[in-house]
């Protein structure tokens, strides 16, 4: 069975969501990922807080090290609210990183995140960057966000590499048997 590791790499986040699943855990007591874990991993999902709050070079370094030292890892995904995806010069800023990952999973948390996402999804270079062959991106839309998504989606056509998934706020983060929630020994 393919082993999937949700790797918590940072506490940094621009939100204070009342139902954040990270509040259910003492993050310091999560198991620390080991070399043996990484040697078994098929997929690594970088999570946190929000990995995009790290310096771009830090995030690229983590992805590069996983790719170089663990050839068995077939997929690397980054989970984000999308808040830090939009920056001035977003395409050139994130292009190298997007070439190194299998996709991004975006779960906007507030109206500002949706505005930034709306802007990005109307940028041809951004859409092209997330439409590379083999990429698999997800946009998570929570129950109370469908009206916002329906308004935004009228003006854009997402590449086939994007999947829209309805979500409910989950008070528990229970992983299936082949998935593991772990952390780095030292968080960024």
Regions found by a protein language model. Give the residues of each.
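Alpha-helical scaffolding within the catalytic cores
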Residues: 28-35, 87-93
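Structural recognition of alpha->loop->beta junctions
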Residues: 38-39, 89-116, 151-181
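N-terminal active-site wall of soluble small-molecule enzyme domains
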Residues: 58-68, 77
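Auxiliary Fe-S-binding modules of radical SAM enzymes
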Residues: 122-188
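Structural preference for beta-strand elements that scaffold enzyme active sites
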Residues: 4-6, 43-45, 73-77, 101-105, ...
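Canonical Radical SAM [4Fe-4S] cluster-binding loop centered on the CxxxCxxC motif
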Residues: 1-31
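Core AdoMet radical
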Residues: 23-28, 41-54, 70-87, 97-122
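Acidic (Asp/Glu)-rich catalytic clusters
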Residues: 35-39, 70, 92-99, 124-131
């Amino acid at each position: 069975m393919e082993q999937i590791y949700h790797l918590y790499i940072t506490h940094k986040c621009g939100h204070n969501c009342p139902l954040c699943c990270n509040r259910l855990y003492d993050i310091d007591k999560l198991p620390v990922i080991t070399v043996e874990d990484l040697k078994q991993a098929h997929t690594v999902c970088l999570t946190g807080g929000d990995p995009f709050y790290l310096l771009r070079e830090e995030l690229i370094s983590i992805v590069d090290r996983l790719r170089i030292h663990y050839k068995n890892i077939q997929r690397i995904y980054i989970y984000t609210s999308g808040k830090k995806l939009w920056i001035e010069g977003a395409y050139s800023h994130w292009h190298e990183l997007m070439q190194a990952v299998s996709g991004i999973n975006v779960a906007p948390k507030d109206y500002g995140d949706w505005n930034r996402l709306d802007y990005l999804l109307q940028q041809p270079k951004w859409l092209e960057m997330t439409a590379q062959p083999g990429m698999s991106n997800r946009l998570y839309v929570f129950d109370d966000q469908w009206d916002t998504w329906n308004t935004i989606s009228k003006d854009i056509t997402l590449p086939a590499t994007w999947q829209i998934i309805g979500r409910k706020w989950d008070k528990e983060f229970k992983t299936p048997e082949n998935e593991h929630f772990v952390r780095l020994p030292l968080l960024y």
